[in-house]
Structure formats: C-alpha cells, structure tokens
C-alpha cells in the first residue's frame, strides 16, 4: 500500500481480522544533558562535571468494539476467549526517570576519560490485579537500579573510538560492555568495528501483561538476557557491507502455543518463553 502498488491501492480491499480495533500511544519526554567545566579556560587539560536527566511518561490504549470478526465468511475469535463480549478498552501505563552524574577528564592528546554513577527508576502498571484459580497476575512492575561505570573516547588522526563499561551496584546483576572503533581512510572510505557484551533485564511485557483476552494475561520472573555481539562494516564508493555475529543466552521470544483446533479456527495464541 505504501509503495503505491496498484494491486493494493484500495486499502479497504485488504482483508484483515480486526476491522473495528484501534491502538493509541501517547508519550511525554523531558531530556537535559549539560556539563560544567571546572577549569576557567579551555586548555589541553580540562575537567568537567556532567549531568544527564531523562523523564518519560507513556500511555498505551487498545480499543476494540466487538470481539468476533469475519474472515472468508467465517466468524473468527482471533485472540481466543475474552472477558468481554464488546467494548474492549485495555490500558497500559509506564513512566521512567534516569539521572546520571559524571566526572570527565579531557586531554587533547590522550582523549576523554569519564567516570559516572547513575540512578534508574521505572514503574510499569495496570489498574487492577487479576486473580485466577491457580495464579495471580499482579498490576505493576517497579524497578530501581543504580550503576557505576566509565567511558573512554579517543580521536586521533584517522582513528576514533569509544569504550564503555558499566555495572549495577544494586541487587540486579546488570552489565554493559561496548567497544567501538572507526577508521576513516579518507572522506569516502570508512571502516567500523564493534564488540558488545550485555546483561540486561527482560522487557516489561515479557514479565507482566494484562488484557481483556483470557490467554493474554501473565506474570513471570524471567532471567536476564545475555548478548555477545561482534560486528563490522565498510563504507566505500563501490560497496557498503556489514557483518554481525551474535550469541544469545536466555533469549526471550513469543512462542506460538495455539492448538491445532485453534489454528484451524484462525485463532492466534502466543506466550512469552525463554
């Protein structure tokens, strides 16, 4: 449709499962990144105090007028059984606040050395707790994470690079190692190399999700995802090439758990898995 293919020019001719559903995402963001140079005049050696602040607030809504839909003349319950027969209105709320305070030493020959501590707080929540016969789906995930780390930036002649390492100092075991180098042979030829080793928390919607659809409600406690990644790229007048090799541990994904009967009825059921 977006490519203006004449076969799909009339969008209403495309058959979809949900003809009366809509989704809405609203967000607000405040971002401040500033620094103060301790030494009075810019010189070959400089000392800075850095501060970064980020606040985000998001609201997501999914609305659907009627639960059943039509496909090839058949009535389809696309996401299975629902607590409601009509008027679905599911809402998710999320807010986060991030503060980072750092001290940076800059030398025109050696590069920049930064040491920092940060504070991350988030709240992901719904307006109700769901109680089933054998399980309970909570209404909120709250996180408070403090980390410490360092970063080194180097720019000399045709080389520039950034090396970052941070690790949580609170109960969560989180870490991030990111090393990136770029070589500019000339204005038209650049080569980039990067290595990442990340230990991160699962996305919130894997650990907590609520919906008007019965099968789409869960509360989990998955392990952290671990990612090892090596990549390289080359940009030249003749070719743009890139390479990436990644090893994933405790990878999270949504698994199709629909039964044969549900698939025959065009019902789609997925569940988070690790």
Where are the language model's segments positioned?
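Outer-membrane beta-barrel porins/channels
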Residues: 78-86
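Short hydrophobic/aromatic-rich motifs at helix boundaries and adjacent loops
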Residues: 3-7, 72-75, 148-153
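Exposed, low-structure sequence patches enriched in small/polar residues
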Residues: 20-68, 86-274
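A generic structural signal for ordered alpha-helices
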Residues: 8, 12-13, 81-82, 159
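Solvent-exposed, glycine/polar-rich loop segments of beta-barrel outer-membrane systems
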Residues: 65-78
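Acidic/polar loop-and-plug regions of large Gram-negative outer-membrane beta-barrel proteins
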Residues: 1-25, 29
